[in-house]
Swiss-Prot record:
Any one annotated GO CC term: sperm flagellum
Record's function text: Microtubule inner protein (MIP) part of the dynein-decorated doublet microtubules (DMTs) in cilia and flagellar axoneme. Plays a key role in the assembly or attachment of the inner dynein arm to microtubules in sperm flagella and tracheal cilia. Forms filamentous polymers in the walls of ciliary and flagellar microtubules.
Name of the protein in question: Tektin-2
Keywords (A to Z) from UniProt: Cell projection, Cilium, Coiled coil, Cytoplasm, Cytoskeleton, Flagellum, Microtubule, Phosphoprotein, Ubl conjugation
Family named by the database record: Belongs to the tektin family.
GO terms under biological process: cilium assembly; flagellated sperm motility
InterPro entries: Tektin-like, Tektins
Phosphoprotein as UniProt keyword: yes
Species of provenance: Macaca fascicularis
Coiled coil: 82-160, 273-379
Length: 430
């Protein structure tokens, strides 16, 4: 007889089964509603954050642009200030050198005045008299000493102010370099975007680095540097004007005294011998030719230095262009032009060197002939009278130093710190 096999397990009631189905359906609806709410909120959040991010990026880009403009304006002002400062330094240096040259030039009239007094001590008997010539010579010495003191004071002031200008220039240069670096950094930041390959997360990027300043401190610092530079340049301009005035006044005083002294000497002047006059004329022309040739040699040397700088520039450009990447390393018109420029400069430099050597050979020949002329002049100068020697010595006050060499240095003079190149050459030739 067959039997019913029933699996032993828990049996739920039908209401439980309905309740379970209802709960599953209800929970599914609730989960979908919650998910829908989250999705809507997420979309709103995405829109808001995207808009905020875009606005923030645009706002900060605008701020970077404005900051770059501000820094660039300051950089341009510093550029102008540095240019003006360099020009003022050059101008003041030239004025200081001019004052120094004028100061050095006062040694010559002082030597001449003392030499004339020494020469006139050789007078004998009744001629040893305190005459107007001697009075004017003593007065000339006093005027020269006063002018040297005034010029030395101006040279010292110019040197001190040049030190201040160099200090200001260093500060302006430091500020200018800082702004150049800042512009490079900010322009690099401005060029970045979401697709830039070198963007990454950084450790604590919002930190405030040590040494940070406020915007007002930054502006005050730049303004202070600019104001200080302008103030020092203004003071330098005033100093240059004062130096120029001092030079003019001292030269006028010395010239007036020279005229007065030579007026007293004029009645004592005698004519030179014909041969001496001829030799002196030849000496003068030779000195003028030497001066002109020296000037041409200086111009040749300057041109040669300039051509070397141009050659360095061309070499540097050619070398730099060898580092162009890949197919960019092409022999374009710029490459051919730079190569031609190098060849042209090398030929020019060779021609200038050849002409410079010829000019120096000609100068040596002129110096040798000048030495022979002066030896003959020195022999004939021994026969001149004392007052004639005095007037001949005083000719050095009206003839440029590089064009005049005394025939005979017979008497003790005040000591010059350095000899001119012309005198040194003559000593070597002798």
């Amino acid at each position: 007889m067959a039997t019913l096999s029933v699996k032993p397990s828990q049996r739920f009631q039908l209401p439980d089964w309905h309740t379970n189905s209802y709960l599953l359906s209800t929970n599914a609806q609730l989960q979908r509603d919650a998910s829908h709410q989250i999705r809507q909120e997420a979309r709103v959040l995405r829109n808001e954050t995207n808009n905020q991010t875009i606005w923030d990026e645009h706002d900060n880009r605008t701020r970077l642009v404005e900051r770059i403009d501000t820094v660039n304006r300051w950089k341009e002002m510093l550029d102008k200030c540095l240019t003006d400062l360099d020009a003022e330094i050059d101008a003041l240096t030239q004025m200081k050198d001019s004052a120094g040259q004028n100061l050095q030039a006062k040694n010559l009239p002082l030597d001449v005045a003392i030499e004339c007094l020494t020469l006139r001590e050789s007078r004998r008997d009744i001629d040893v008299v305190k005459d107007p010539v001697e009075d004017e010579l003593h007065k000339e010495v006093e005027v020269i000493e006063a002018t040297k003191k005034a010029l030395q004071q101006k040279v010292s002031q110019a040197f001190e102010h040049l030190c201040l200008l160099q200090e200001v220039r260093q500060q302006l240069n430091s500020d200018h370099r800082g702004k150049m670096e800042t512009l490079e950094i900010d322009r690099g930041c401005l060029s970045l975007n979401l697709r830039s390959p070198n963007i990454s997360l950084k450790v604590d990027p919002t930190r405030v680095p040590d040494g940070s300043t406020t915007l007002q401190q930054w502006d005050d610092f730049s303004q202070f540097n600019k104001d200080r530079g302008e103030a020092e340049m203004k003071a330098a301009t005033e100093l240059r004007e004062a130096i120029a005035l001092t030079i003019a006044e001292t030269n006028n005083e010395l010239e007036a005294q020279r005229v007065a002294t030579e007026f007293a000497f004029r009645k004592r002047l005698r004519e030179m011998e014909k041969v001496y006059s001829e030799l002196k004329w030849q000496e003068k022309n030779t000195l003028e030719e030497i001066a002109e040739l020296q000037e041409d040699i200086r111009h040749l040397e300057e041109d040669l230095r300039t051509k070397f700088l141009s050659l360095k520039l061309s070499h540097t450009r050619l070398e730099a262009r060898t580092y162009r990447p890949n197919v960019e390393l092409c022999r374009d018109q710029a490459q051919y032009g730079l190569t031609d420029e190098v060849h042209q400069l090398e030929a020019t430099i060779a021609a200038l060197k050849q002409k410079l050597a010829q000019a120096q050979d000609a100068l040596d020949a002129l110096y040798k002939h000048l030495a022979r002329l002066q030896a003959d002049i020195a022999c004939k100068a021994n026969s001149m009278l004392l007052d004639t020697k005095c007037m001949d010595t005083r000719r050095k006050l009206t003839v440029p130093a590089e064009k005049f060499v005394p025939e005979v240095d017979t008497f003790t003079r005040t000591t010059n710190s350095t000899l001119s190149p012309l005198k040194s050459c003559q000593l070597e030739l002798a």
